[in-house]
Amino acid sequence: MADLVYPPVIAVVKGFWKYLGFQFDFQGDENIPRKGGAILAINHVSYLDFAIAGTGALPVKRFVRFMAKKELFDHKIAGPLLRGMHHINVDRNNGAPSYVAALKALKAGEIVGIFPEATISTSFEIKQLKSGALRLAVDAGVPIVPTIVWGGQRVSTKGIKPNFKRGKTPVSVTFGEPIHYAKDVDIETASQQLRQVMISMLNQVQEKYPDSHVG
């Protein structure tokens, strides 16, 4: 699909990161398929996670199509940008159209970004995962790449006044090994296993994080 909007938005986002002084650390980008469909299952700790995770995929020249809530698409400024970047509109009261759109994107060879916790974790721990990412992976026949973002919560997260002052905030994006699923996989069991993988990855990221506190 044509990407006329994504590149200029990326340029603006990179400028924003530079202004904030973000110090990025990308790990495991070799685990992102260079071609073909895949799902990034991303933890959710800040309002910046989608842009942070998308930035992490740029070194391998993949644009991520994020599943984002309808309210963002309804915004007069954000909406046209999201549609222009071919992100996927999620209406929580009617999820079928977004599922079909994500499935179509995956079968067309796109990378789809999903936050399986469905909301920001205010404890910064991995919440219970919704099953949608697993079901999509099975139906589309694509792998899930567990993805951990960390650091954005220090700038903008749920329930805390954002702090957009310039600084030197370490921000990391870690991509785990792709997980492939059989057609007859038990979704509930696989979801719990994916959560455990993400918990383990998050613990490792926190241990290596340059600051002593986790939040």
What are these model-derived regions, one by one?
Residues P33-N94:
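Catalytic core of membrane glycerolipid acyltransferases/transacylases, capturing the structured
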Residues H86-E110:
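Helix-adjacent hinge/juxtasegments
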Residues V100-A108, V171-N203:
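A charged, well-structured terminal subsegment
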Residues M1-G28, R34, I52, V60, ...:
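A transmembrane-helix-recognition feature enriched in membrane-embedded lipid enzymes
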Residues F124-I187:
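A cross-family acyltransferase "interaction/gating" segment
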Residues G56, L81, K104, R135-D139:
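Hydrophobic/aromatic ligand-binding patch that stacks against planar heteroaromatic rings
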